[in-house]
Amino acid sequence: MEHLPQIQDTLRIASINRNYCWNGKSPDGRGAQSDLLLESKADRTDYLCEMKFTGGKYAITKNDEEDFLNKIEAFAASKMHNKTHSIQLVMVTTMGIARGEHASIVNQSVVLDNLFSDRKTQIL
């Protein structure tokens, strides 16, 4: 991934042990996939990254929130997740996340400018 160093720097991740795309099923059998997973043993955190590209701030809908919760639940139940790690939902978007009823599901946000400059994370 071309911009992995910028994402790592923006999120202030000390080291990334593995990065990959992931797919699996939640305990109730629903499918789930993540655009990018970053594992950091140093931070004891798995960063589940969702990428959304729009002309403005991305507004998270109720359906998005349910989908993200399903992805988190599915990954938490998978063999790929180190059970001692926390899971953080990271949105990589063009212009950031619009404030709204469902935005609190997101732990951190990376915007397009972060990928091409030294500006840091937008923590929600």
Residue map of PLM features:
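A cross-kingdom feature that marks ATP-driven nucleic-acid transaction machinery
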Residues: 1-124
